[in-house]
Amino acid sequence: MKIWLDGGLQDIDSARVSVLDHGLTVGDGVFETAKTVAGRPFALTRHLDRLARSARGLGLPEPDLDEVRRACSAVVEANPVALGRLRITYTGGVSPLGSDRGDHGPTLV
């Protein structure tokens, strides 16, 4: 199985998110789950609009929705199934312990 992590497809067995990612340490992140049918995410535009709105609500940097679309397409193409789920996770990224965000930038899975 392949996943998207910060700019490219990776094998699920080797992909790693830092334990210092703010999505893990303080819940600083948002996610969407889209149904996929015949290799296409259902209502992807609505899901991405909600992802961006939720990110703004947390004060996260605006997600690059073109990159998110490319990621979704790449993951669906790399993992062909007739019916599936596509989980999009966007976090504050690697940051120091505590509530301040670091300079590393957001994480996209």
Language model segments and positions:
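Conserved alpha/beta cores of soluble small-molecule-handling proteins
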Residues: M1-V109
